[in-house]
Structures are given as structure tokens and as C-alpha cells.
């Protein structure tokens, strides 16, 4: 699991940037709408909607905005359909990149994603070209200060895959994709309140980057993240701490 913390440093950098851009609201409005469309408007019986609801509230989205997004999903007409589409490719330095999107116009989204890859020295690939380098997992994160021993015991009892303590004292619990909601609920019932919980694509191998390549890869990730239809971007880039410090 050593690669997870390296992957996380890119993720946390992106989260700070997303918050500044205000894109996080758009992201969770779409997720609320799609989750409600697929599983109904009751978070009690729709785990995906419940997760999106928690995320939206955590981003300080108003209840009114949340309710409108859910209502739009439940009552959406065929003409309002939003598709979930994934794109795969390679960035500078041979870094594998996965892009998750939600779109009402697949041609527009495909063109925009392809343009980003091309402009930043990467190549958009075909389905399956890099997906085999990633595993879909659940990640449940806890802030520093949580009782580590008790959390590990509870996580193992809930059939979590692994528990990783990060340098800053925060703890990540990793689960299988299918077991994510069960583990999350079990930890919550045991009294552990997560700081974050989500389904992620974790790389099974990593590409260690120098400063020059890291700058190029992060430029591509930034450009992809800036696209309106993009929800998540994952890569197998591993940026050493000393390089990340130089990047700021």
C-alpha cells in the first residue's frame, strides 16, 4: 500500500485547487442527480446518493440546492440524460491516466479530453489501454487523532482490505469496491466518523517522476480537471516528496 500516500499527495493538491475554483459544487450536483436517477431519491435505500449527499453537505452546499439536484434526477426526462463515460490514456513519462466524466454530449466531452491529452504531450487511448493498471477500491479517510488501534480492529472486523497510517497522522481504510458501503456503515456504527469516503481508482504500479516530468503531468491533470464534464482524474504518477515540495 506504499503507493497510496504518493498518489494521495496529488489528490490532495487537486482538492485544494478544486475548492478554489468552485468546481466542487458542479461535481456534486451532477453526482446527486445521476445517483438519484439510478437508485431513487431516498438516501436511506440508495447508498450512492447518501455518499453524494454527505459530500455535498461537506462542501457547504445548501439543502435547497441539494434537493433540486435530487428532484431533477428523480424526475428527469429522457432529454436530460447524463451519461457516465470513462477515458484512458498516457501522459508525459508514460504515466497512465484514467478520466471519469458525466456528460450530456459525448462528442463534446471526447473532443475536449482528447485535446487536453494532445496539448500536454499525452495520448488518449482506447478502452482498456490503462484500466488494467488500476483497481477500483473504497477509501475511507479519518483525521489525525483517531484511536489507531481501535480503528484498525474495527476495520478488520468489518472486512476492510487494508489500513494505512499517513505521515500526518491521518488514517485511510481501503476496501473492496463491493464492500465499500458495508465497511463504511460498520465503522460509523462503531463510532468512527470519517473525514472523507469515496470510490477511487488505485494504481497497481507507479511511475516515479522527476521535476520536469511532474510539471508536465500535473499540467495535463489540471487541464483535464478544468473541463466541465470531468468528475475525477486518476493517475499512477508517483511524485517524491522533495519534488512535490519544489512544485509547491
Curated annotation (Swiss-Prot):
Q: What biological-process GO terms show up in the record?
A: regulation of DNA-templated transcription
Coiled coil located at which positions?
none
User: Where is this chain's protein located in or outside the cell?
Assistant: Cytoplasm
Presence of keyword Transmembrane helix: no
Keywords for the protein's UniProt record, in alphabetical order: Cytoplasm, DNA-binding, Transcription, Transcription regulation
**One GO CC annotation, please?**
cytosol
Could you tell me which Gene3D superfamilies the record lists for this protein? 1.10.10.200, 3.30.70.980
Molecular functions per Gene Ontology: DNA binding
NCBIfam families hit by this protein: PRK00110.1 (NF001030), PRK12378.1 (NF009044), YebC/PmpR family DNA-binding transcriptional regulator (TIGR01033)
Tell me its family.
Belongs to the TACO1 family.
Q: Which protein is depicted?
A: Probable transcriptional regulatory protein Psyr_1407
What organism is listed for this UniProt entry?
A: Pseudomonas syringae pv. syringae (strain B728a)
